[in-house]
Amino acid sequence: MSDNYTPRLKAQYREEIREKLQAEFNFDNVMQIPGVTKVVVNMGVGDAARDSKMINGAIADLTAITGQKPQVRTAKKAIANFKLREGMPIGARVTLRGDRMWEFLDRLLTIALPRIRDFRGLSDRQFDGHGNYTFGLSEQTMFYEIDVDKMDRPRGMNITVVTTATNDEEGRALLRRLGFPFKDKDGKMQQAD
């Protein structure tokens, strides 16, 4: 990438969204305006306990989707009922920051989420009390980087968007202005202001 390239969503946040959030919440200091810190994409592969090759598919999918090599997560404790031993690989995780984070969010919101069949919006009740938002996707095929013909099996993933918001209301306002398609109480998608 060239040095003067700025991701589209990052530029939109800096030029438009920050001013609207400052006006909406009457912040005295620009450092109080909520922003996105990082995005964590986690793919749990419980079957990897029985077949260690399963984790390779998850690593390949996450690498293609995020453009970054994932960290393999291992079991911390042995659980006999799940035939799980300590140190076995059970998932993969990627933490995105900076321009890669903005590019991933842009692709997620403009390309991936609209490709989900019968998509009616994301629930706005999945905030953690500190303005961070977590949601799950049931399979990885909505990302255009994944070739459906070469995919070995569908895998779900959890995506956590970590913000600097102090409460859920600020986090919800930030993500709605970034373009997250939240459902309202009637189950219809809300429009961004």
From Swiss-Prot:
Tree of life domain: Bacteria
What are the entry keywords? Ribonucleoprotein, Ribosomal protein, RNA-binding, rRNA-binding, tRNA-binding
What GO cellular component entries does it have? ribonucleoprotein complex; ribosome
- Looking at the keywords, is rRNA-binding present? yes
GO MF terms here are: rRNA binding; structural constituent of ribosome; tRNA binding
**The keyword rRNA-binding appears for this protein:** yes
Give the multimer and partner information: Part of the 50S ribosomal subunit; part of the 5S rRNA/L5/L18/L25 subcomplex. Contacts the 5S rRNA and the P site tRNA. Forms a bridge to the 30S subunit in the 70S ribosome.
PANTHER family the record matches? 60S RIBOSOMAL PROTEIN L11-RELATED
**Protein name per its UniProtKB record:** Large ribosomal subunit protein uL5
Gene of this entry: rplE
